[in-house]
């Protein structure tokens, strides 16, 4: 963990960094130590020709099984995606359908939360700053490959509450085009053993 924080300090300007940079490092340390989290989410998945909106209840665990239960639209409410290790499956009314291992290069609404949390914990911080989202001040953290130019490859933007450190929103982009957007409410961290 110390190495990850030192590398992050380098990209954020090192000692004497701004308030936003220090806040980003504090949040990263907290997310590295967390055992899990719960939240409600609104997810938009944009596949170019098709856009899907979902309401989702999330229970994510660092160890063991995580669950994403669809709450909207009504015609698929109750469908639950379960994630454990490298395995994912869908479950509804007791029936279970295997979907096979997650593809490391693939991205779907089901895999978006683990991807967002991975960026929060270990993603290269390309930029961070305080900005206004709606009517509140938030911390925005932009992550991407350190060798990539902005707008190329996969990028991630994360917005955090500066007081509670709750994840408020996350966006995943591919080549400058936002493909997944998650807006979180009631985000609660479960501290790790050291927390």
Predicted regions and their residues:
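Sec-dependent N-terminal signal peptides
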Residues: 1-4
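An acidic-aromatic
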Residues: 60-112
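N-terminal leader/targeting segments and the immediate start of mature chains
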Residues: 8-56, 60, 65, 191-195
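Short, cysteine-centered beta-strand-loop-beta hairpins and adjacent loop/turn segments enriched
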Residues: 46-51, 73-77, 147-152
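Flexible, processing/modification-adjacent segments and terminal tails
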Residues: 32, 41, 45, 90-149
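Gly/Pro-enriched, hydrophobic low-complexity segments
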Residues: 69, 127-195
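One face of beta-strands
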Residues: 37-43, 52-70, 79, 88, ...
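Short, exposed beta-strand/loop patches in secreted or surface proteins that constitute
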Residues: 29-31, 56-61, 81-82, 123-132, ...
């Amino acid at each position: 963990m110390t190495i990850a924080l030192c590398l992050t300090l380098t990209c954020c300007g090192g000692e004497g960094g701004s308030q936003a940079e220090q806040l980003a490092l504090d949040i990263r340390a907290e997310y590295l130590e967390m055992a899990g989290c719960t939240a409600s989410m609104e997810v938009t998945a944009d596949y170019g020709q098709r856009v899907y909106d979902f309401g989702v209840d999330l229970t994510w665990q660092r160890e063991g099984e995580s669950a994403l239960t669809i709450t909207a639209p009504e015609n698929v409410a109750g469908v639950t995606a379960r994630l454990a290790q490298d395995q994912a499956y869908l479950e509804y009314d007791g029936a279970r359908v295997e979907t096979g291992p997650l593809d490391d290069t693939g991205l779907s609404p089901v895999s978006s939360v683990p991807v967002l949390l991975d960026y929060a914990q270990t993603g290269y911080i390309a930029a961070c700053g305080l900005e206004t989202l709606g009517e509140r001040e938030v911390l925005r953290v932009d992550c991407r490959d350190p060798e990539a130019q902005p707008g190329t490859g996969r990028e991630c933007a994360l917005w955090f509450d500066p007081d509670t450190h709750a994840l408020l929103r996350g966006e995943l982009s591919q080549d400058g085009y936002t493909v997944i957007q998650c807006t979180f409410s009631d985000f609660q961290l479960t501290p790790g053993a050291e927390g």
